[in-house]
């Protein structure tokens, strides 16, 4: 039914083994191309997601988005080959830091994500984390906000997939999510941050720790809501 597939013979359509929580993912093969079809399970601002993925594609860090069908609740984009990793070596960390820096340079006009409003937990630990953050300037950039290993593809390059949570927020939130998701030890964390930040930029470890606390709490809240 889509012009995208006119004059293309569909050879295969299959449900992918690796599935996300927010979408059903299908691989569609034509005679000369492979596509990812994402059937939405949850409500999100999909127009914003499509726009952000296009901006990220322009920076060579995402699959090319091809079609958004809000009526049928699906998005089609180019299929990316790559490997998911749960453990990162120095080369991976360096590449990931550079791609993240690239993402954070993208200009987007949007209403920023309010982390405090997003969290239902008002635990002492969470409150203390937000008190710490009040001491620091908010460095608002376009963040992916869901950098778990299943959303990062490694080949010669690094690319991100599943952009539904992407929005403007402090860049330390993405940095914290990488540190948490890959369980980086002190040495790996220092190496990662050293390749993300410019030499003239100060690294605020206290701010990073506060964002780790908030990220973990948001993950817990999200999984409990499923």
Residue ranges and their predicted role:
Residues 7-16:
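Conserved N-terminal boundary motif of the eukaryotic protein kinase catalytic domain
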